[in-house]
Amino acid sequence: MTNFYKVFLAVFILVCCNISHAVVSFIGSTENDVGPSQGSYSSTHAMDNLPFVYNTGYNIGYQNANVWRIGGGFCVGLDGKVDLPVVGSLDGQSIYGLTEEVGLLIWMGDTNYSRGTAMSGNSWENVFSGWCVGNYLSTQGLSVHVRPVILKRNSSAQYSVQKTSIGSIRMRPYNGSSAGSVQTTVNFSLNPFTLNDTVTSCRLLTPSAVNVSLAAISAGQLPSSGDEVVAGTTSLKLQCDAGVTVWATLTDATTPSNRSDILTLTGASTATGVGLRIYKNTDSTPLKFGPDSPVKGNENQWQLSTGTETSPSVRLYVKYVNTGEGINPGTVNGISTFTFSYQ
């Protein structure tokens, strides 16, 4: 009976008594690992759908509700900082580099992953605005979670990433609260992981070099500047994996910096005052030339197919155009390259 009374009294005192002054202590770990040890993640995406974010279906992260014990009106927020180099951005959020091929999106915040702040840059930033505990004991936690990002065009491959330091979160006392000598900063490292990256693309069924014979015309068929006459036509055909949307860019092989819609004639041409324009299908607007690159969003890139087409094709029409410089008859030769982007 006496022993029971002592236990009951101890519990009663712990519950009933208020904390009359601000207190804080560190009860976490200064070094923390993010994600499972030796994680392995797999995904499939179109070859040029980059940067490609791995959505693993769960959070690759670290969370701990008990990093600091606080009480007695102590006010605390959190700041976060990423130490990895910024190699790009996606929807306003920094992409941080791990290797040449693999990057990270990073979120930091309090214990709840869903309230994490999307990190940008390499400066300290507010990741949890904070709160003031009442006259009782409680805890302050934190969380970090990441998503891998494929950065570069490649064939299907496996990428291994070694353990890497990410950055830090620090406790930020405010409203007169002070941490004193208490540990305020904790560090994070990403555990090693492997990405099994499968890419989808297309195969060109048309020969890689296509010669279009241009019809002979008279100068009288192009009487005014801007007048056009059909010179020739050809088609491009591909066989694609399911879900691939094909985009294409025409590049002027003679003048690669050309961004107009008139193809430069080669040095072998003897005619002057005439140029070539290229149209696709039934479009009334000619295609413009752009850089020789498969990068998503390349200048003057145009959509050739949708993701529902596995055997896409495009009909191309080449037209003579009067450039307004006075036509002198002769031969006309032009070279354009096509670069496909599988998105």
Swiss-Prot record:
Thylakoid is among the record's keywords: no
Gene: f17bG
Highest taxon in the source lineage: Bacteria
Annotated segments matching region Receptor-binding lectin domain: 23-199
S-S pairs: 75-132
Function: Essential fimbrial adhesion factor that mediates binding to N-acetylglucosamine-containing receptors in the host intestinal microvilli, leading to colonization of the intestinal tissue, and diarrhea or septicemia. Also confers adhesiveness to laminin and basement membranes.
Protein name per Swiss-Prot or TrEMBL: F17b-G fimbrial adhesin
Family: Belongs to the fimbrial protein family.
Signal peptide positions (record): 1-22
Subcellular locations according to the entry: Fimbrium
Residues annotated for a carbohydrate binding in this entry: 65-66, 110-111, 138-141
Molecular-function annotations in GO: carbohydrate binding
GO biological process assignments: adhesion of symbiont to host; cell adhesion involved in single-species biofilm formation
Keyword entries, A-Z: Disulfide bond, Fimbrium, Lectin, Plasmid, Signal, Virulence
InterPro entries recorded: Adhesion_dom_fimbrial, Adhesion_dom_fimbrial_sf, Adhesion_dom_sf, Bact_Fimbrial_Adh_Pro, Fimbrial_adhesin_lectin_dom
Region (Fimbrillin-binding domain) location: 200-343
Entry GO terms, CC: pilus
Biased composition range(s): Polar residues: 298-307
Region (Disordered): 287-307
Stored Pfam families: Fim-adh_lectin (PF09222), Fimbrial (PF00419)
